[in-house]
Amino acid sequence: SVENSRPTGQQLESLDLSAPWEQSLPCTERKPSATARLSRRGASLSSPAESSGSPQRRGLSAPSSRQIPAPQGAVLVQREKDLPNYNW
């Protein structure tokens, strides 16, 4: 259970760091609007995992590890598709 909790924490940290990093970019003023919406979805999925993850580590450790990478990939794909749409 400890091993599963470690990668989840690293993934959550990466999500937290990705949000301010995108917002810090001055050139992408229109992009943060789209990325912020997607980041909120990711945060909403990660926040319950953190709060409910502490009491139910065994139950959420396996599903959270499986659920986290799937949304990340989907979010990245959505960003790639959304950004060019805004640019055009």
From Swiss-Prot:
Subcellular location: Secreted
Biased composition (Low complexity): 33-55
GO BP annotation list: G protein-coupled receptor signaling pathway; positive regulation of cytosolic calcium ion concentration
GO molecular function terms noted in the UniProt entry: kisspeptin receptor binding
A matching Pfam family: Kisspeptin
Transmembrane feature ranges: none
Annotated Basic and acidic residues bias: 78-88
Residue(s) carrying Phosphotyrosine: 86
Biased composition (Polar residues): 1-13
Region (Disordered): 1-88
Keyword Cell wall biogenesis/degradation appears in the UniProt entry: no
Expression across tissues: In the hypothalamus, expression increases with puberty in both male and female monkeys. Robust expression in the region of the arcuate nucleus (ARC).
Superkingdom classification of source: Eukaryota
Keywords in alphabetical order: Cleavage on pair of basic residues, Phosphoprotein, Secreted
Family designation: Belongs to the KISS1 family.
Biological function: Metastasis suppressor protein. May regulate events downstream of cell-matrix adhesion, perhaps involving cytoskeletal reorganization. Generates a C-terminally amidated peptide, metastin which functions as the endogenous ligand of the G-protein coupled receptor GPR54. The receptor is essential for normal gonadotropin-released hormone physiology and for puberty. The hypothalamic KiSS1/GPR54 system is a pivotal factor in central regulation of the gonadotropic axis at puberty and in adulthood.
Protein name: Metastasis-suppressor KiSS-1
Naturally occurring in which organism (per UniProt): Macaca mulatta
The organism's taxonomic lineage, starting at the top: Eukaryota, Metazoa, Chordata, Craniata, Vertebrata
